[in-house]
Amino acid sequence: MKAVVFAYHDIGCAGINALVAAGYDITAIYTHPDAPSENHFFGSVARTAAEHGIPVYAPNDVNHPLWIDRIKSAQPDVIFSFYYRNLLCDEILNSATVGAFNLHGSLLPHYRGRAPLNWVLVKGETETGVTLHKMVSRADAGAIVAQHRVAIAPEETALTLHHKLTQASSDLLKDILPVIKTGHFPEVEQDHSQASIFGRRTAQDGCIDWHATAQEISNLVRAVTDPWPGAFGYVGGSKFIVWKARALEGLQAAKAGTVLSVSPLVIATGGGALEIMTGQTENGVYMQGSQLAQTLGLVAGAIISSQPVSAIKRRTRVLILGVNGFIGNHLTERLLQDDNFEVYGLDIGSDAISRFIGNSRFHFVEGDISIHSEWIEYHIKKCDVVLPLVAIATPIEYTRNPLRVFELDFEENLKIIRDCVKYQKRIIFPSTSEVYGMCSDKVFDEDHSNLIVGPINKQRWIYSVSKQLLDRVIWAYGEKEGLRFTLFRPFNWMGPRLDNLNAARIGSSRAITQLILNLVEGSPIKLIDGGRQKRCFTDISDGIEALFRIIENKNSNCDGQIINIGNPDNEASIKELAEMLLASFEKHPLRNHFPPFAGFREVESSTYYGKGYQDVEHRKPSIRNAHRLISWTPTVEMEKTIDETLDFFLKTVELTEPQA
């Protein structure tokens, strides 16, 4: 049976050796070059491949068409991935006639994602294992073929557990590989409701929170001890690393981070006390805890912290252009709930953000971005993060005022981008789900889906293309001039303060606001082309939480990334949206103050939007990047969003006497 293998690390070596022992014909092995910054305590897949006389490659992008063609030309029966760090595209997965299999270091569906070895220790688990599963587009979500359980001892470290998992992988593969060879093997679908997903870990994740319990800190130490970078804390401005520690019970309570004794070195935590058994200063040598205390100049009663005293930073200054808009005002509210942020905003109106005026951390100027260029440049220079949210984003304007869309959405925003490059400021740019255009993929993926638009005479694409070109310009500035950026793509965010009913009266609003106006005025709800178009509707609170996490940018996860923000579970046609809205309207307490429902009316898009319009049948996001980079999953159901949006708008209407 011919196999193509993707592998890295010790488990990659174990997988290759198991395949050879089972008599598989490995035609090629794909691996990663060793990173100079990484501690190479593990075996080399490249060396293992060479010892077996198997061709080995380390492409920068294995999903490039050239590599896809090479893999397909090998006509593999099976594909195996053993700790390979990149996802494989569907074309590669589908090239294996029997199937593609991945070996994952946990008992799926638990601990999907990156670094499960470390995460299970951080979380204090007593059992883990390895899982061989079928590979599908969604990471770690395919049917389970085989599992091998591994007990976690109380004093287990990441390295000892790693060795156990490597042996478990060899044992599992020894049993299952001959079965796969027959073409008849078990496939048990995962219970996705039980899935847990974890992101990658970096050295900064070793920072000790002394307010955690002693057992939680001990678990962290075990999870990241040598050869990983280690758990760490600070005495004043000096960093120290903890290599071995244990939780103690029954000691006198004290403020978290307080040194209780120096021989042994014992620190008070948020629950119990922690004995530091071994550690070292940042540039020192490995030593016992009491010597570490002496080296750091510690005495009983001293305070240890989670960050250097000199690094306690000022608030992050966030510049929001278009702060009075739908996203801008909700984002401002979320940022002001966290004392770590200060908001500077510009917009041509202030009705939505008037509730923040007077907050000492909110600074607002009324103005137009096309006029106040000097103010904008000064504040880009002054602030840390820039969000240019000003844009014309209502479909009817794309055909009614295409040049104005281009001038504002592209030209004015390009100036802002260039100022961010000039002053080396981080930009979080609102791309759009519209950039995917008429893409035929079932779900739209930030890194792989094609961006397809219609002919030039369909002017509705001027918004999509303006945004796409800015995405490409920002990406190029990131590659060539070091611009720090994140592109986020909202998928049909809804909620209170989305447009307003006056905008809806002239057709310049999003779908739900237009539908609410029809109900309020007693006019027929117009279903463009029958309302068959499907969209994935996202609650504004879910969207803002994702955007807030992008601004936080823990471990710089979001730098240079594109992130879809949408709710694929809230997919509905525009007609279904209208029907759900009508049901909510009919049961609302204020219903009797409004005219009777006037029915639905189907309208051709060219009649409503003009001859330059063209629509898209579906638009569903992949949110894999959001899961992976910011640990985000939307939670609000569409019915709740509709109820809250309708309630907000009905309460803004000047009520008449109840209808008879």
UniProtKB/Swiss-Prot annotation:
Q: Which residues bind UDP-alpha-D-glucuronate?
A: 393, 398, 432-433, 460, 492, 526-535, 613
Give the enzyme's EC designation: 2.1.2.13, 1.1.1.305
Entry GO terms, CC: membrane
Which chemical reaction does it catalyze? UDP-alpha-D-glucuronate + NAD(+) = UDP-beta-L-threo-pentopyranos-4-ulose + CO2 + NADH; UDP-4-amino-4-deoxy-beta-L-arabinose + (6R)-10-formyltetrahydrofolate = UDP-4-deoxy-4-formamido-beta-L-arabinose + (6S)-5,6,7,8-tetrahydrofolate + H(+)
Oxidoreductase listed as a keyword: yes
Q: List the GO molecular function terms.
A: carboxy-lyase activity; UDP-4-amino-4-deoxy-L-arabinose formyltransferase activity; UDP-glucuronate dehydrogenase activity
Residues annotated as site: Transition state stabilizer = N102
- Pathway(s) the chain acts in: Nucleotide-sugar biosynthesis; UDP-4-deoxy-4-formamido-beta-L-arabinose biosynthesis; UDP-4-deoxy-4-formamido-beta-L-arabinose from UDP-alpha-D-glucuronate: step 1/3; Nucleotide-sugar biosynthesis; UDP-4-deoxy-4-formamido-beta-L-arabinose biosynthesis; UDP-4-deoxy-4-formamido-beta-L-arabinose from UDP-alpha-D-glucuronate: step 3/3; Bacterial outer membrane biogenesis; lipopolysaccharide biosynthesis
Active site: which residues?
H104 (proton donor), E434 (proton acceptor), R619 (proton donor)
Region listing for Formyltransferase ArnAFT, in residue ranges: 1-304
Identify the stretch(es) annotated as Dehydrogenase ArnADH: 314-660
Site note Raises pKa of active site His applies to: D140
Q: Which UniProt keywords apply?
A: Antibiotic resistance, Lipid A biosynthesis, Lipid biosynthesis, Lipid metabolism, Lipopolysaccharide biosynthesis, Multifunctional enzyme, NAD, Oxidoreductase, Transferase
**A GO BP entry:** lipid A biosynthetic process
What job does this protein perform? Bifunctional enzyme that catalyzes the oxidative decarboxylation of UDP-glucuronic acid (UDP-GlcUA) to UDP-4-keto-arabinose (UDP-Ara4O) and the addition of a formyl group to UDP-4-amino-4-deoxy-L-arabinose (UDP-L-Ara4N) to form UDP-L-4-formamido-arabinose (UDP-L-Ara4FN). The modified arabinose is attached to lipid A and is required for resistance to polymyxin and cationic antimicrobial peptides.
Q: Which family does it belong to?
A: In the N-terminal section; belongs to the Fmt family. UDP-L-Ara4N formyltransferase subfamily.
State the protein's name: Bifunctional polymyxin resistance protein ArnA
Please spell out the taxonomic lineage of the organism that makes this protein: Bacteria, Pseudomonadati, Pseudomonadota, Gammaproteobacteria, Enterobacterales
